[in-house]
Amino acid sequence: MEASPKKPEALQRPDIKQQSFAEIYGVPENFLEIEVRSPQTHGIARKMYTDYEIVCRTNIPVFKLKSSVVRRRYSDFECFREILERESTRVSIPSLPGKVFTNRFSDEVIEARREGLEKFLQTVAGHPLLQTGSKVLCAFIQDPQWDKNQWI
């Protein structure tokens, strides 16, 4: 029986290393999970507002805490976005969900806004230039004492 001819080097498959269980199912090298949840409406009549819980889980070193939970209202997001725009001129900051003037406390409006705020934060927090270059990003996501007046 004749030996099969050797394939040219370009066609040979490189040696494939078997991955261990830990490599397949372990914590990724860098991960960032941002969730906006649990909207709560406070106040009465013209003083009503809704705030949202921001949950962050990460192992990215620029974030001081591996996990955090803070609450922010829509006006905080507006201020945060303005600060990001001033701070990060090389990055196009995405829009927030639009302001709502009628039925703003209905379940549908609150849920749509929650989804929009979550998408906004995931996009902003996941941007490599903002992760390394923004001073306000980590504070907004993780500091329960965040005060917009410190940044204006």
Swiss-Prot record:
Residue span, PX domain: 30-147
Keyword S-adenosyl-L-methionine part of the UniProt annotation: no
Entry's Gene Ontology molecular function annotations: phosphatidylinositol-3-phosphate binding
Gene Ontology biological process: endocytic recycling; late endosome to Golgi transport; protein transport
Entry keywords, A to Z: Cytoplasm, Golgi apparatus, Lipid-binding, Membrane, Protein transport, Transport
InterPro entries: PX_dom, PX_dom_sf, PX_Grd19_PX, Sorting_Nexin
Binding site for a 1,2-diacyl-sn-glycero-3-phospho-(1D-myo-inositol-3-phosphate): R73, S75, K99, R104, R113
Compartments in which it is found: Cytoplasm; Golgi apparatus membrane; Prevacuolar compartment membrane
Main location: cytoplasm
Keyword flag Transport: yes
Membrane topology: Peripheral membrane protein
Pfam families: PX
Gene Ontology CC terms: early endosome membrane; Golgi membrane; retromer complex
Domain statement: The PX domain binds phosphatidylinositol 3-phosphate which is necessary for peripheral membrane localization.
The family this protein is said to belong to: Belongs to the sorting nexin family.
Task of the protein: Required for retention of late Golgi membrane proteins. Component of the retrieval machinery that functions by direct interaction with the cytosolic tails of certain TGN membrane proteins during the sorting/budding process at the prevacuolar compartment. Binds phosphatidylinositol 3-phosphate (PtdIns(P3)).
Name used for this protein in its record: Sorting nexin-3
Organism: Yarrowia lipolytica (strain CLIB 122 / E 150) (Yeast)
This protein's encoding gene: SNX3
